[in-house]
């Protein structure tokens, strides 16, 4: 334990002792609670036993009567902030029993009441409580405890307190909490929907940001709310046309069609805007002599050029947000993308009236929900089109500049650590094992489309050099659910069995994908636009106990298919590992709110059956790929079969998962093609050797009898091969009659060899080439020469005696390698010719059983890999 951890434990212990008799002075008490909150914020989740023991008296003291029911509001908020940190530390376990947790939730919900007061002393603590509740998902525990009244009160506080001056993090936290409560509720009462419906009325008294929050929540839960929303509207007694258009579209079942129409309209407007921007760029290039120097000074004008893209101050809210990103100064809350009106906080006061005027015009033309969706979609399009000129602005692939942007999104007390989730008692282990999207929620929504833009660029650059790769990518996108899982499993076995004597790399769940990524990394050399993607995090969580070996030889093979110059295996392995890490690190970030509303909503039906997805395992800290095999409509659960053969029945709404994107599917398809080529290549020598037929088997057995060194020694050096080949040529020039006679003699010797020794022994000795055998080949150079001399007379006696009667002593002598030829037995020229031919054949034939042994070792290796214990979820 480090000194800082020990010091932190001492601070926690002292605070717990002080809570027994807290300071009587209000100022001293608030100062003490402030220090305690800072100390608790430094404690990591799931701490060691010593820290848990130090926290025990502190946890009891915080729920004591003196502090818990204090009359001062700031003291209550400070206590609630400390308790919310404790719920984060102890997650996924609740820190208190059910009755105490109900009281804790009352205190937490009461702290949300004055979120509107930004000048309050406790404002930062209120924001911290809000973010912690969203991350730990403790609102699900409120559902389990049937705290419906508290949930309704919390909804009311959110919709009343939200303001334009709040950061995007506040807006997204409120949205996530409300969406989660509605999605996880088995039955949604009309009282819970009442504050949301009140906020979407066509009433001037309701603030625009409150209406936008309510509409966003309704949009996220549209599929589930159809029945409940209709009943709530009827019970309210307010006509349907008095509400926002999104309410009518959900009740009438036209919400999905409305979204599709909106997307089409956005694409048309975007294409027209793109043409206008190109003409603006040309005009600006002709008018302004120094483009780069004049553009920043021309901010108050109608157009300016930044990175080659014309931007207009009064064109739209989205254009202003683009200008904000191009600005090199400090940026304010990137997640204000969810709140389009707040994206202009850094602009000058002269620009704000124009922006508000544009928003009002849009609201007159269409509904509020259309305006919100339009601003998001067009913002995404604005950034996707000039992606080639704005690569440095990419959120997912940019260098450490983006880390400061991500840090800006957090509040004063935001911590860069993973947060587990409090489990739902009804959902059991399923919810307990789901990790909250900690960093994914902090990233702006541009991250997903920008990633897509980079993928498109990569595909286009790859198409110029290798059209076949692009065709494979298209096939994967068209048929992602057919043969992909089986091919992936085959490729995993192939990699595992490709080498027997090489040292293996430490195994991971993604072992098969590393070889796939090695192939992709070569393509990224061609697509130079994506060179910056190599700067990725250098740590990868590995799944324990899942042993699938990867050797350097297999990495060479996978990269060699691209006809690139041979690279050292160390560099190639490191490059492929970086790419695999990129896949692991990027996927949590892509699970944003927008993707949740469109993608994760599918988990309630059968539309996911047959899809390739990846599921987050919090204990292993890794994503595992699999296929959605089936869906149980009664239980609303999916059967997921992982690539390693494991099966799970999951309630996907409680899991952290995401469908495989095009890049990952294309990697799988490329690996499948590569595996097919390897299998075809491995079968070609087998068929060639099979043509030798009976003779190769016969030569194998006779060589075993004569040499006494086993067929594993029959693999000679190239020099010996050439000498024997020349000897073959000489003997082949002899008469054809002698060859026919020798064939008959060998047929009889084959029968004797089969009687003496079962075929199993030959197969095993021929195929098992251990390190000991390999070393014996090099050591027995001299014994080979003598064994060859012994081989000729021994074979001659075998063939000559085979006609007269059974041979007993000769095979026994030849097996030990000590048998000597009888002086009286003279070998005929025909037998000599056949001996030399059999020697040359034995040079080649022992390679034949190798694939069988490979298959055996592959099976044993596969069984070993599956025997590794997977951490229980």
Swiss-Prot record:
<feature type="compositionally biased region" description="Basic and acidic residues">
    <location>
        <begin position="266"/>
        <end position="301"/>
    </location>
</feature>
<feature type="compositionally biased region" description="Basic and acidic residues">
    <location>
        <begin position="844"/>
        <end position="853"/>
    </location>
</feature>
<dbReference type="Pfam" id="PF20168">
    <property type="entry name" value="PDS5"/>
</dbReference>
<feature type="repeat" description="HEAT 4">
    <location>
        <begin position="189"/>
        <end position="227"/>
    </location>
</feature>
<keyword id="KW-0227">DNA damage</keyword>
<keyword id="KW-0539">Nucleus</keyword>
<keyword id="KW-0498">Mitosis</keyword>
<dbReference type="GO" id="GO:0006310">
    <property type="term" value="P:DNA recombination"/>
</dbReference>
<dbReference type="GO" id="GO:0035825">
    <property type="term" value="P:homologous recombination"/>
</dbReference>
<feature type="repeat" description="HEAT 3">
    <location>
        <begin position="149"/>
        <end position="187"/>
    </location>
</feature>
<keyword id="KW-0131">Cell cycle</keyword>
<feature type="compositionally biased region" description="Acidic residues">
    <location>
        <begin position="661"/>
        <end position="681"/>
    </location>
</feature>
<feature type="compositionally biased region" description="Low complexity">
    <location>
        <begin position="822"/>
        <end position="831"/>
    </location>
</feature>
<comment type="similarity">
    <text>Belongs to the PDS5 family.</text>
</comment>
<feature type="compositionally biased region" description="Low complexity">
    <location>
        <begin position="854"/>
        <end position="866"/>
    </location>
</feature>
<feature type="compositionally biased region" description="Polar residues">
    <location>
        <begin position="418"/>
        <end position="438"/>
    </location>
</feature>
<feature type="compositionally biased region" description="Basic and acidic residues">
    <location>
        <begin position="726"/>
        <end position="746"/>
    </location>
</feature>
<dbReference type="GO" id="GO:0006281">
    <property type="term" value="P:DNA repair"/>
</dbReference>
<feature type="compositionally biased region" description="Low complexity">
    <location>
        <begin position="701"/>
        <end position="725"/>
    </location>
</feature>
<dbReference type="GO" id="GO:0051301">
    <property type="term" value="P:cell division"/>
</dbReference>
<comment type="function">
    <text>Cohesin cofactor dispensable during the meiotic division but playing an important role in DNA repair by homologous recombination (HR) probably by helping SMC5/SMC6 complex. Regulator of sister chromatid cohesion in mitosis which may stabilize cohesin complex association with chromatin. May couple sister chromatid cohesion during mitosis to DNA replication. Cohesion ensures that chromosome partitioning is accurate in both meiotic and mitotic cells and plays an important role in DNA repair.</text>
</comment>
<feature type="modified residue" description="Phosphothreonine">
    <location>
        <position position="289"/>
    </location>
</feature>
<dbReference type="GO" id="GO:0007064">
    <property type="term" value="P:mitotic sister chromatid cohesion"/>
</dbReference>
<keyword id="KW-0597">Phosphoprotein</keyword>
<feature type="compositionally biased region" description="Polar residues">
    <location>
        <begin position="336"/>
        <end position="348"/>
    </location>
</feature>
<feature type="compositionally biased region" description="Low complexity">
    <location>
        <begin position="494"/>
        <end position="510"/>
    </location>
</feature>
<feature type="compositionally biased region" description="Low complexity">
    <location>
        <begin position="795"/>
        <end position="814"/>
    </location>
</feature>
<feature type="compositionally biased region" description="Polar residues">
    <location>
        <begin position="303"/>
        <end position="319"/>
    </location>
</feature>
<feature type="compositionally biased region" description="Acidic residues">
    <location>
        <begin position="747"/>
        <end position="757"/>
    </location>
</feature>
<protein>
    <recommendedName>
        <fullName>Sister chromatid cohesion protein PDS5 homolog C</fullName>
    </recommendedName>
</protein>
<feature type="compositionally biased region" description="Basic and acidic residues">
    <location>
        <begin position="373"/>
        <end position="394"/>
    </location>
</feature>
<feature type="compositionally biased region" description="Basic and acidic residues">
    <location>
        <begin position="535"/>
        <end position="555"/>
    </location>
</feature>
<comment type="subunit">
    <text>Interacts with the cohesin complex.</text>
</comment>
<dbReference type="GO" id="GO:0005634">
    <property type="term" value="C:nucleus"/>
</dbReference>
<feature type="region of interest" description="Disordered">
    <location>
        <begin position="266"/>
        <end position="611"/>
    </location>
</feature>
<feature type="repeat" description="HEAT 2">
    <location>
        <begin position="99"/>
        <end position="136"/>
    </location>
</feature>
<feature type="region of interest" description="Disordered">
    <location>
        <begin position="658"/>
        <end position="873"/>
    </location>
</feature>
<dbReference type="GO" id="GO:0009556">
    <property type="term" value="P:microsporogenesis"/>
</dbReference>
<feature type="compositionally biased region" description="Basic and acidic residues">
    <location>
        <begin position="320"/>
        <end position="334"/>
    </location>
</feature>
<keyword id="KW-0132">Cell division</keyword>
<feature type="compositionally biased region" description="Basic and acidic residues">
    <location>
        <begin position="456"/>
        <end position="466"/>
    </location>
</feature>
<dbReference type="InterPro" id="IPR016024">
    <property type="entry name" value="ARM-type_fold"/>
</dbReference>
């Amino acid at each position: 334990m480090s000194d800082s951890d020990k010091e932190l434990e001492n601070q926690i212990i002292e605070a717990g002792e002080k809570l027994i008799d807290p300071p009587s002075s209000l100022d001293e008490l608030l100062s003490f609670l402030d220090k305690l909150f800072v100390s608790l914020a430094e404690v990591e989740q799931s701490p060691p036993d010593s820290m848990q023991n130090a926290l025990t008296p502190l946890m009891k003291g915080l729920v004591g009567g003196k502090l818990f029911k204090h009359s001062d509001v700031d003291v209550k908020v400070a206590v609630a902030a400390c308790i919310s940190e404790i719920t984060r530390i102890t997650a996924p376990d609740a820190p208190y029993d059910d009755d105490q947790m109900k009281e804790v939730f009352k205190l937490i919900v009461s702290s949300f009441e004055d979120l509107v007061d930004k000048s309050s002393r406790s404002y930062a603590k209120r924001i911290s409580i809000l973010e912690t509740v969203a991350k730990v998902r403790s609102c699900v525990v409120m559902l389990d405890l049937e705290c419906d009244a508290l949930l309704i009160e919390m909804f009311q506080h959110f919709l009343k307190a939200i303001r334009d001056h709040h950061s995007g993090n506040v807006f997204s936290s409120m949205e996530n909490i409300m969406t989660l409560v509605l999605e996880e509720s088995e039955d949604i009462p009309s009282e819970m929907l009442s504050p949301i419906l009140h906020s979407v009325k066509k009433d001037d008294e309701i603030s625009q940001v409150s209406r936008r929050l309510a509409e966003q929540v309704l949009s996220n839960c549209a599929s589930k709310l159809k029945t409940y929303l209709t009943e709530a509207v009827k019970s309210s007694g307010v006509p349907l046309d008095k509400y926002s258009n999104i309410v009518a579209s959900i009740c009438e079942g036209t919400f999905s069609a409305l979204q599709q129409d909106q997307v089409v309209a956005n694409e048309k407007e975007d294409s027209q805007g793109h043409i206008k921007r190109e003409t603006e760029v040309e005009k600006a290039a002709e008018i302004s002599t120094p483009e780069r120097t004049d553009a920043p000074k021309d901010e108050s004008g109608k157009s300016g050029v930044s990175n080659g893209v014309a931007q207009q101050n009064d064109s739209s809210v989205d254009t202003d947000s683009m200008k904000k990103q191009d600005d090199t100064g400090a940026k304010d809350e990137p997640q204000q993308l969810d709140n389009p009106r707040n994206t202009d906080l850094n602009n000058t006061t002269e620009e704000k009236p124009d922006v508000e005027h544009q928003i009002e015009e849009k609201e007159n033309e269409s509904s509020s929900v259309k305006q919100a969706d339009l601003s998001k979609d067009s913002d995404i399009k604005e950034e996707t089109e000039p992606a080639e000129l704005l690569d440095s602005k990419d959120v997912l692939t940019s260098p450490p500049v983006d880390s400061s942007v991500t840090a800006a999104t957090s509040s004063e007390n935001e911590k860069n650590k993973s947060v587990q989730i409090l489990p739902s008692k009804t959902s059991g282990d399923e919810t307990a094992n789901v990790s909250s999207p900690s960093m994914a929620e902090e990233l702006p929504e541009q991250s997903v489309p920008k990633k897509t833009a980079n993928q498109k660029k990569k595909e286009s650059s790859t198409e110029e050099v290798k059209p076949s790769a692009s065709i494979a990518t298209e096939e994967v996108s068209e048929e992602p659910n057919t043969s992909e899982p089986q091919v992936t499993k085959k490729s995993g076995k192939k990699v595992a069995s490709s080498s027997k004597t090489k040292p293996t790399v430490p195994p991971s769940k993604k072992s098969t994908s590393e070889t796939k990524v090695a192939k992709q990394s070569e393509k990224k050399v061609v697509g130079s636009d994506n060179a910056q993607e190599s700067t990725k995090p250098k740590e990868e969580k590995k799944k324990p106990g899942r042993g699938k070996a990867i050797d350097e030889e297999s990495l060479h093979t996978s990269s060699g298919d691209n006809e690139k110059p041979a690279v050292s295996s160390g560099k190639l392995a490191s490059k492929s590992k970086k790419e695999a890490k990129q896949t692991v690190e990027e996927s949590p970030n892509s699970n944003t709110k927008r993707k949740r509303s469109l993608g994760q909503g599918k988990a309630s039906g059968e539309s996911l059956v047959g899809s390739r997805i990846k599921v987050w395992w919090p204990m292993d800290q890794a994503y595992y790929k699999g296929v959605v095999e089936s869906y149980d409509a009664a239980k609303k659960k999916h059967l997921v079969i992982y690539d390693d053969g494991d099966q799970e029945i999951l309630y996907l709404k409680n899991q952290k998962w995401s469908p495989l994107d095009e890049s990952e599917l294309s990697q799988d398809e490329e690996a499948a093609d590569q595996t097919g080529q390897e299998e075809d290549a491995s079968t070609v020598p087998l068929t060639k050797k099979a043509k030798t037929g009976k003779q190769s088997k016969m030569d194998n057995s006779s060589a075993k009898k004569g040499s006494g060194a086993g067929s594993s020694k029959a693999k000679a050096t190239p020099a010996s091969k050439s000498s024997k080949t020349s000897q073959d040529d000489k003997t082949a020039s002899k008469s054809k009659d002698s060859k026919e006679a020798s064939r008959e003699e060998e047929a009889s010797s084959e029968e004797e060899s089969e009687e003496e020794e079962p075929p199993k022994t030959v197969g095993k000795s021929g195929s098992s080439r251990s390190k000991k055998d390999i070393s014996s080949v090099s050591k027995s150079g001299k014994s080979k020469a003598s064994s060859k001399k012994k081989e000729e007379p021994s074979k001659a006696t075998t063939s000559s005696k085979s006609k007269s009667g059974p041979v007993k002593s000769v095979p026994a002598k030849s097996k030990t390698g000590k048998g000597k030829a009888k002086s009286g037995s003279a070998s005929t020229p025909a037998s000599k010719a056949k001996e030399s031919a059999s020697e040359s054949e034995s040079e080649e034939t022992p390679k034949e059983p190798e694939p069988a042994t490979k298959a055996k070792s592959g099976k044993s290796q596969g069984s070993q890999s599956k025997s590794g214990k997977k951490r229980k979820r």
